[in-house]
Amino acid sequence: FQHITPTCHSLWRSLACVQDGVLSNRNTKTRGGISSAGTLTVRAGMLNNQQGFMVGQKDMTLNAGTLDNRQGVLGSQASLQISSGTLMNQKGALKAGTDMLLSGGDVSNQEGTLAAGRDLNAHLNVLENQQGTVVSNGNSRLDVTRFDNQGGRLVAQQSLTLSSTDIINDAGGLIQSGASLNLRADTLSNRNSGDRGGVISQGPMTLNAGTLDSTA
């Protein structure tokens, strides 16, 4: 991969970055990073935003084979759409002022934050959310092959739909909706919920699981 370090910082019109190799914006949280007052579109073989800062006031679209946002900040005041084969967001933050759409392969969100101001939709292979937070102020819909939420939080202020082959919600993990909750899984482990964890709905709950383990 060829490494390209962007020189743009504050842009008052739409910004598009296309790079077949590595687009690096790492270590920019304390010195500006990339910001756009318009839409922001990035396409790269790898986008490295580790400890970086990348924000837009309007819609943001990111397409990368690998996206590294460990301890970084990626955010849009409008919608945020990310397509990535591998997304690393450990202790990082992905935030959308309105809707968030995540699609692709594996997402590592240990101690990280995925937050949508409105609806959140995710179509993924694996979502690792140990001690992490996935939250929306609207509806959330997640279709993932494997969801590990040990000690993590998946919260929708409105309806929540979660479909997965394997859901691990142990060790105080929380899956919660403010309205209806629809959960489908081949295997659901909900052990050791404690006082703050478990599967909680403020509205109707539909639970379909081939195997359910909810021991204390």
Per-segment meaning from a language model:
Residues F1-A216:
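A composition-driven surface/loop motif
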